[in-house]
Amino acid sequence: MIYAYDKVYLRIAQRSLGEMLSYAVYDLGYELEDYYKRFLQSEYSMRFSKGDLFVITGMSGAELAIRVLDIPDDDIIMPSYNTAKSQEYWTGWILAYYQWENGKTFEMIDKEIPICKIRNMYNPYHEMDISSAILKLREMSQVSSCLLYTSDAA
């Protein structure tokens, strides 16, 4: 498989997406689903999916959230950078890996597995090896694809 960007950038991408979701929820007060819709509608979602290194490595997760929401400079809230990793951080972290691995856009992934279902995987998957969570996401994607296919055929 050809990946959108080299694996050397993957950890940075995971951290960035995790920080973005955590900042949007805990510092800006957005509901995860509401913010994630804004991300999907922004140009940054597609640019991230395609491996745009400026989006992936050129800014922090908080900066990415600020750009997605187009927050004026005077209204920017400094990120709290909590050392404890939240469910939202883990959601972004695992989502970035899953997106990198399968090459789907975030929009395609969201149609198969809504962001709230990924967040709900936090317990017990954040304690497990990443491969367990990725395997579960693949299974969820296949079930969703089968359901979409059978509903279209009916």
Please provide the spans of the model-predicted regions.
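Conserved small/polar residues in nucleotide/adenosyl-binding loops
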Residues: 149-154
